[in-house]
Structures are given as C-alpha cells and as structure tokens.
C-alpha cells in the first residue's frame, strides 16, 4: 500500500511508481517531501520539517531533565522561554534562519526586559555575557534538532559570539562597609553581612548554613549545601562541596553574636539534592540565620532565601547612602580585601570554592595589578623585618 495515496489519487499507481523510480535514479528523491505523513519517516531517519520551535524546545528540555541538576534545568527553561517570546513559539523550527537569529540576538542585547519581582533593572538590554549564554542555549536546541533528524541544518553555523568585556569586581571599601553595617536595622543583619564579607560564601550557601557545620573552637566552617530556588542542593562546584573555611576573627565574632540569637532554636531535617539525578540525602540543620529573629511580619519561613538576602542588602545600601551594587559584591569584597592583605591566591580560591587559583587570577587580575603599590608597601613592611641588607662596603666595590 502506498502511503498518502489520497494526495496522489489523480495519478495512477504506475505513474507514481515511475516518477519515484526516476527521482531515485537521478539522485533527487526526497522521501519526506514525497510522503510527508508516512510512518516510515522516523524509521528512515528523515528530517521532519513540521515541528514548531516550541515543540522542539520541549523535546530538548524533556531529555535534559536527567542530564543536569534541577537548578540548571530551570535556567534552561527560563532562558528558552524568554527567547521564544521574541522568536514566536508557533514558528516552525525549520523556518528560523541566520538572519532571524541575529535579529533575536539584537533584541536580547538592546531591547527592554521584564524584571523579576523586586529586581532593579537600571538600563535596557542585557550584557554581552548574558546574551551569549542565551544564544548558546538556543544553539543547543537547534543542534539537538539536527542530531535527531528534526532539522536538516543548524542555522547557527557562521554566527560568532559577541565580544565580551570581563566584569571588574566592585568591592566595598572599608569605610563603605562600616556604613553598611551601621545602616543595618538589627543585630542579625549586622552579623549576616559580617560573615558574608569575611568568608566570601555565596548567598545560597549563607541561607543554607547550619550550626552543625560550624566549629568555633577550631575556627572552621564547612560548606555542605546551597539553597537554589526552592530546594537545597550541594554547593555550585565540586571543589566547593564540603569545603572547610578557616574563619578570621571578625567572622568568629559575628558568629558568636549570632549564636545568642539562633543556636538553641529548632533543628530541621532537610532534603539535600545531589548532582546525580534522583539522589537526595536527609541532613540535620539548625539554621544560623533565621527570618523569625528580625521579621516584622508573620509570613516568614524557617530560613532566608537568596531574594530576601538581596532585598536586605539593597535596603541597607540605600539607607547607608552608598552607590548601588549587587549583593554578590560581598563575595568580591572578601577576595579583594584578602588579596590586599597578602593572602595566597590559592588559599583564597580554596576558601571560595574554586578548583584552583585560575579563577582568582581571571576575575581579579586587573584589580590585583591596580594594587601594585599596596603590594610593594606590604612587602616593604613584611620583608624589612628579616631581609638582610647589602653591606655598604660590598656595594661600593661593585
């Protein structure tokens, strides 16, 4: 039986057979074009041209679910959702060409975006880094379509990434940090930002920090988990998982102060999700920082969220009269202050959860070179105490 026979009911079976045989003989036969509704298309690995970009993206995301962590999957979904709103989710994937992709990239780079709840958008568009990330995710969708026979070609061929300028850290100065702490409305907020700045932990790690992870007697703090969106996960990087942070005195003092507020509070049993799909572990956690201690309203949770910490930072920055920065600059402040104090970059990388010092050099390289005078002054102070001086007589002979 010939598939799609109704399409060809004006032709005899013999005529159809002759035209198909001739197309095969001359090398121009296209099974998918000749029989677009055939059940054999998938068997023969023929490209389907009828998937919308939304349908293709949904197939891609469905298979990604077991490959990546849920936080990464949510990022994929959010990015693709934003892109589809520009492309038009009902457009056929096969209709998207290079010109359309360049239009999408331009819109991402220069157009207005809808901000998340309580987020501050200071200017239209997105950074080149963000746009390149969006386009990389979209490229993965199209490549998935090619690899699995849904598309004949990837329209991303020949499109190069936008040139990126590396983000320069914008740490707080010591005077600004004092003003920030003074602007905090309660002791818990003061303690939280002291711990953040003097340890360099990520905001999500700060939210998930438990007293079970802290050993003030030995001056250490273990980072075992992270809060990502609505669930606990292991820290962002493998190197950052179960890392031991060696606490300096200001951090210890802040934790001792916080101990009086939350150390004897309720212990929770929480589910921590690992990188491996479907694997979780129950952990005991008495949260170090708790909204209940300083909440003005009753609809608080057992722990802070990354958004609530960011709002706390924004409010304190505004009250202190400081130039607006993102709360992640507290982490950069730790790194920059530590480098100025002469700490080994490898030690800083370990404290911050990086695999090696390469990330420290990449992120803070320019900042480090701008502080050469401070480094020379540091060396003069430290080395002058024990470095031998050249004898004057020997110097005269030479």
From Swiss-Prot:
CDD domains xrefs: INT_ICEBs1_C_like
All residue ranges annotated as the Core-binding (CB) domain in the record: 51-146
Database matches in InterPro entries: CB, DNA_brk_join_enz, Integrase-like_cat_sf, Integrase_catalytic, Integrase_recombinase_N, Min27-like_integrase_DNA_bind, Tyrosine_recombinase_XerCD
Keyword DNA-binding: yes
GO biological process, one term: symbiont entry into host cell
Protein keywords: DNA integration, DNA recombination, DNA-binding, Viral genome integration, Virus entry into host cell
Any single Pfam family the record assigns to this protein: Arm-DNA-bind_2
Gene Ontology MF terms: DNA binding; site-specific recombinase activity
Residue intervals of the Tyr recombinase domain: 167-378
Gene3D superfamilies: 1.10.150.130, Intergrase catalytic core (1.10.443.10)
UniProt KW DNA-binding keyword: yes
Active site: 202, 236, 331, 354, 364 (o-(3'-phospho-dna)-tyrosine intermediate)
Taxonomy, superkingdom: Bacteria
Matching PANTHER family: PHAGE INTEGRASE-RELATED (PTHR30349), PROPHAGE INTEGRASE INTR-RELATED (PTHR30349:SF36)
Family: Belongs to the 'phage' integrase family.
Function: Integrase is necessary for integration of the phage into the host genome by site-specific recombination. In conjunction with excisionase, integrase is also necessary for excision of the prophage from the host genome.
Name of the protein: Putative defective protein IntQ
Organism, as annotated: Escherichia coli (strain K12)
Lineage: Bacteria, Pseudomonadati, Pseudomonadota, Gammaproteobacteria, Enterobacterales
Gene of this entry: intQ
């Amino acid at each position: 039986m010939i598939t799609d026979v109704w399409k060809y009911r004006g032709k005899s079976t013999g005529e159809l057979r002759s035209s198909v045989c001739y197309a095969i003989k001359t090398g121009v036969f296209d099974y998918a074009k000749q029989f677009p509704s055939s059940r054999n298309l998938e068997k023969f690995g023929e490209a389907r041209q009828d998937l919308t970009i939304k349908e293709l993206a949904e197939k891609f995301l469905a298979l990604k679910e077991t490959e990546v962590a849920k936080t990464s999957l949510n990022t994929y979904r959010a990015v693709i959702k934003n892109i589809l709103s520009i492309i038009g989710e009902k457009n056929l994937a096969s209709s998207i060409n290079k010109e359309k992709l360049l239009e999408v990239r331009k819109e991402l780079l220069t157009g207005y975006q809808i901000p998340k709840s309580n987020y501050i958008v200071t200017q239209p568009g997105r950074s080149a880094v963000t746009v390149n990330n969006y386009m990389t995710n979209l490229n993965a969708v199209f490549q998935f379509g090619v690899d699995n026979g849904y598309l004949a070609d990837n329209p991303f061929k020949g499109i190069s990434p936008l040139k990126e300028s590396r983000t320069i850290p914008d740490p707080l100065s010591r005077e600004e940090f004092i003003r920030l702490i003074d602007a905090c409305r309660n002791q818990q907020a003061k303690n939280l930002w002291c711990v953040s700045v003097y340890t360099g932990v990520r905001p999500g790690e700060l939210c998930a920090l438990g007293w079970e992870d802290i050993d003030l007697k030995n001056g250490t703090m273990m980072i075992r988990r992270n809060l990502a969106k609505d669930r606990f996960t292991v820290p962002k990087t493998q190197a950052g998982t179960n890392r031991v942070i060696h606490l300096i005195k200001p951090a210890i003092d802040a934790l001792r102060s916080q101990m009086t507020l939350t150390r004897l509070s309720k212990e929770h049993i929480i589910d921590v999700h690992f990188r491996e799909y479907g694997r979780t572990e129950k952990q005991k956690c008495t949260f170090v920082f708790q909204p209940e201690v300083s909440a003005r309203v009753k609809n608080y949770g057992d722990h802070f969220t990354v958004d609530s910490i960011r709002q706390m930072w924004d409010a304190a920055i505004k009250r202190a009269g400081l130039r607006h920065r993102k709360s992640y600059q507290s982490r950069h402040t730790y790194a920059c202050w530590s480098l100025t104090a002469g700490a080994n970059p490898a030690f800083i990388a370990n404290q911050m959860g990086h695999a090696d010092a390469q990330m420290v050099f990449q992120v803070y390289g320019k900042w480090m070179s701008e502080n050469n005078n401070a480094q020379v002054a540091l060396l003069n102070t430290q080395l002058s105490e024990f470095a031998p001086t050249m004898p004057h007589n020997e110097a005269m002979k030479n």
